[in-house]
A protein has these predicted regions:
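A substrate-engagement module of RecA-like helicase motors
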Residues: 41-42, 46-168
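Short, surface-exposed connector motifs at secondary-structure boundaries
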Residues: 13-17, 38-43
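Extended, Lys/Arg-enriched charged tracts that mediate electrostatic binding to polyanionic substrates
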Residues: 168-174
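Walker A/P-loop NTP-binding motif
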Residues: 8-9, 28-41, 58-62
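Well-ordered alpha-helical segments embedded in enzymatic catalytic cores
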Residues: 2-6, 30-34, 156-159
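Walker A/P-loop
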Residues: 13-31
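Active-site proximal loops enriched in glycine and acidic residues that flank catalytic Cys/His/Asp
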Residues: 21, 46, 174
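Conserved pre-motif I regulatory segment
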Residues: 1-19
Length: 174
């Protein structure tokens, strides 16, 4: 409770706060409650993608619902975490596969892309995050075609960025 009050005071006074607390002490709720009650834009940066997903999928909705505050929440990851329609299509037609797993994984990614709204590869647990096929079906800053891309309008990265711009709370990782 003391941590939540200190965080609320720091937010209200536009101040800074450095705080430390042990595992299982409720740090997440201690900062979420005052942040959501304060209104305005909030960016939460986590140290891991697992914690980022936990905040987005579980903790934030729980706190938002308990407080009954109408805040929108967006998840924003680096571009290598999203399937690229253009590179997926290229992999399907021109891909070089070193193993049968690559071919099997490509099929699963293709099906997933047809069903997902986000294109976030963490939503497809059937394909390991370190599977080599991901390098063929995601983009980098260097190989992204941007507005020249024939799949530009369906781009999962741009969709995630647009949702983040419109959201009250954005969950990122560093």
């Amino acid at each position: 409770m003391e941590l939540a009050q200190a965080i609320a005071e720091a937010i209200n006074s536009n101040g800074q706060l450095i705080a430390e607390a042990g595992t299982g002490t409720g740090k997440t709720f201690a900062y979420l409650v005052p942040a959501l009650l304060a209104g305005g834009k909030v960016v939460i940066s986590t140290g891991t993608k697992n914690l980022q997903d936990q905040l987005f999928q579980r903790d934030l909705p729980t706190v938002r619902d308990a407080l009954k505050v109408p805040v929108s929440i967006a998840l924003l990851k680096g571009r290598s975490n999203y399937v690229c329609h253009y590179h997926l299509e290229r992999a399907q037609t021109e891909g070089t596969f070193k193993t049968r797993d690559d071919i099997r994984h490509l099929g699963k990614i293709t099906k997933y892309t047809q069903m997902t709204q986000s294109g976030d590869k963490s939503g497809l647990s059937d394909v390991p995050e370190n599977a080599p096929i991901w390098m063929q079906v995601t983009s980098t800053r260097e190989n992204c075609l941007g507005q020249e891309c024939p799949q530009h309008k369906e781009c999962f990265v741009l969709k995630a960025r647009k949702e983040a711009m419109e959201a009250d709370v954005i969950v990122v990782n560093h």
